[in-house]
A protein has these predicted regions:
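Repetitive helical segments and hydrophobic/amphipathic motifs
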Residues: 11-14
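Short amphipathic beta-strand and strand-loop transition segments with alternating hydrophobic
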Residues: 67-75, 156-162, 219-221
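Short, solvent-exposed mixed-charge patches
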Residues: 270-271
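N-terminal mature ectodomain segment of secretory-pathway/periplasmic proteins
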Residues: 28-118
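Sec/Tat signal peptide C-region and signal peptidase I cleavage site
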Residues: 16-23
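Gly/Pro-enriched, hydrophobic low-complexity segments
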Residues: 33, 99, 112-114, 124-125, ...
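Phosphate/NTP-binding elements of NTP-utilizing enzymes
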Residues: 121
Length: 271
């Protein structure tokens, strides 16, 4: 979930006073908006994504991708962002391409996805029938990585404290879906100074019966003025399965072209 952090250029007393009032009356909605939805990830970026899947017995499966991402949130139209993953490892899957277009809330459109299989030299559409489906076979579901506006769910500020020089907020979120995948999520946010340095660092997911299902921990890296995942780990408390995502070799605002995010480019190969 990526959007923009807008810095307010203000030196007048009314704006300073507004900041003081905000500091005294932080709401759960403010925390979610400023520390999550407004997180700036660049206008586009490319990186290496390493995904390690580990079962309860300790067996591991490793996948390495080249990742290309572009933000369309500020443009006209329904598209929110586009992403392409090209497999580098394992070698027997090298060149396999995956493309995903996500749409803005309120557009009424589900994500579009395509998979290119070099062995068959064919592209096929990949539909998401169930939001509980696992993204890249990991412990993150498609629901987990989808964009949700603040007003789509109910939020409650459970705790606010200072720890290690940072302001820590704990927010409980209850999805408002008719058939929610989770009864609630409890997220920890850490703010180091102002809102431009505030990120989500832990999420607890509770199943529809209120039992803890999985825990996600997140560390972040700042590249230029953009925030991206560094290492993210998800542990399923019921199955013992876990997933680790590592993002490296990041380049921000490199001017990725729209034509990169097309079926033709996916089939031709992205270099």
């Amino acid at each position: 979930m990526r959007a923009f952090k807008y810095s307010v250029m203000a030196a007048t007393l009314p704006f300073v006073w507004a900041d003081v009032v905000e500091a005294e009356s932080v709401t759960a909605e403010t925390v979610v908006q400023r520390c999550d939805l407004d997180t700036y990830a660049g206008d586009d970026n490319r990186s290496k994504l390493t995904v390690i899947l580990r079962d309860a017995a300790g067996n591991e499966k490793k996948n390495v991708y080249r990742r290309y991402w572009k933000n369309y949130a500020r443009e006209k139209g329904d598209v929110f962002d586009k992403m392409v993953l090209v497999t580098e490892f394992p070698l027997d899957a090298k060149g396999t391409g995956f493309m995903r277009w996500a749409y803005k809330p309120g557009s009424g459109r589900n994500v579009d996805q395509w998979l290119y299989l070099p062995s068959l030299k064919k592209i096929r559409r990949v539909s998401v029938r169930d939001p509980a489906d696992r993204f890249l076979g990991s412990d993150l579901s498609y629901w987990d990585i989808s964009l949700r506006l603040v007003e789509q769910d109910e939020h409650r500020l459970v705790e606010e404290k200072t720890q290690n020089g940072k302001t820590v907020y704990v927010v409980e979120t209850r999805p408002s879906d008719k058939r929610p995948l989770y009864s609630k999520l409890v997220a920890r946010y850490e703010k180091n100074g102002d809102w431009s340095d505030c990120n989500k660092t832990r999420i607890e997911y509770f199943d529809p019966n209120g039992v803890l299902l999985k825990v996600q921990t997140l560390s972040w890296q700042k590249v230029s003025n953009a925030w991206l995942w560094d290492v993210v780990e998800v542990n399923n408390r019921k199955t013992g399965h876990s997933s680790v995502f590592r993002v490296s070799d990041v380049a921000i605002n490199v001017g990725l072209k729209d034509r990169l995010f097309t079926e033709r480019a996916l089939k031709k190969g992205i270099r």
